[in-house]
Amino acid sequence: MSKPGGHARHGRRDGIDPVLRSRARRRALQAVYAWQIAGGFAKQVIAQFAHEQAHEVADLAYFESLVEGVLSNRSELDTALTPYLDRGVEEVDAIERAVLRLAAYELLYRQDVPYRVVINEAIETAKRFGSEHGHTYVNGVLDRAAVEWRKMESGASGA
């Protein structure tokens, strides 16, 4: 998986493959969405989707950390998102709600992931799976939230 000279795939020195991370995020979205609809325990949801994911190359460890993180911190994530929403969390479309929870988890708990990556991934995922204009809603919420949640990072870049 590494290129000559020790560089990871796609030229990343940190060994993180952005394609595999994107796939992990998409699978995590599906798992969080299923959990929102059917409920269940984090380990059950992870086990179900990890088994299905075995047929698709993705960052399984990242998938598991996202799903576990969102499910175990749902209340805190919803509280953090609330000031940036124009309606109650449960009133947000289920796909957009899952996208927002995943992105909120990454923005708040995964400081190693640049906020622009989190927002761009969330927008692309909302475009792919959400309602026609869901991605614009997701973008607006996350842009406002990132200014507060990632002050140092967003302030330094002029966002």
Curated annotation (Swiss-Prot):
Keyword terms of this UniProt record: RNA-binding, Transcription, Transcription antitermination, Transcription regulation
Give the GO cellular component terms, alphabetically: cytosol
SUPFAM superfamilies in alphabetical order: NusB-like
In terms of superkingdom, the source organism counts as Bacteria
InterPro entries on file: NusB-like_sf, NusB_fam, NusB_RsmB_TIM44
Where does the signal sequence lie? Answer: none
Instruction: Provide a Gene Ontology MF annotation, just one.
Output: RNA binding
Question: What GO biological process terms are annotated to this protein in UniProt?
Answer: DNA-templated transcription termination; transcription antitermination
What role does this protein play?
A: Involved in transcription antitermination. Required for transcription of ribosomal RNA (rRNA) genes. Binds specifically to the boxA antiterminator sequence of the ribosomal RNA (rrn) operons.
**What family, per the record?**
Belongs to the NusB family.
Designated name of the protein: Transcription antitermination protein NusB
Q: From which source organism is this entry?
A: Xanthomonas campestris pv. campestris (strain ATCC 33913 / DSM 3586 / NCPPB 528 / LMG 568 / P 25)
Gene name tied to this protein: nusB
